[in-house]
UniProtKB/Swiss-Prot annotation:
CC per GO annotation: cytoplasm
Family: Belongs to the P-Pant transferase superfamily. AcpS family.
InterPro entries membership: 4-PPantetheinyl_Trfase_dom, 4-PPantetheinyl_Trfase_dom_sf, ACPS, Ppantetheine-prot_Trfase_dom
The reaction(s) this protein catalyses: apo-[ACP] + CoA = holo-[ACP] + adenosine 3',5'-bisphosphate + H(+)
UniProt protein name: Holo-[acyl-carrier-protein] synthase
Annotated source species: Saccharopolyspora erythraea (strain ATCC 11635 / DSM 40517 / JCM 4748 / NBRC 13426 / NCIMB 8594 / NRRL 2338)
Enzyme Commission number(s) from the entry: 2.7.8.7
Amino acid sequence: MIVGIGTDLVGVVRFGESLERTPALAERVFTPAERRTRDGAARSVTSLAARFAAKEAAAKALGVPSGCRFTDCEVVQADDGRPSLRVSGRLARAAEVRGVTAWHVSLTHDAEMASAFVVAEA
């Protein structure tokens, strides 16, 4: 059963400018693992923008619990390569209350826009 659906669209250039203007923003929004690729290289702004969109989409799918931190939602890569979410803190509690047992995540981006679509399933 679908518990919630969320989507978000992020302007890559504007997001990159925000990261440049406020270097600590990346640490407040992304976990250390999200800021790096599997081989340890820094993620591109485009990739980070897509992950930010996924965090926003996940919050929308659950109705944005108050007091949530962006790092309560981590975009991870499943064993088969698909993106997925690992939730913690208040977001995890909200997901548990709503009976969420699985997350379905789709990310896409080009040079200008990044988008995410998230389905919370029970």
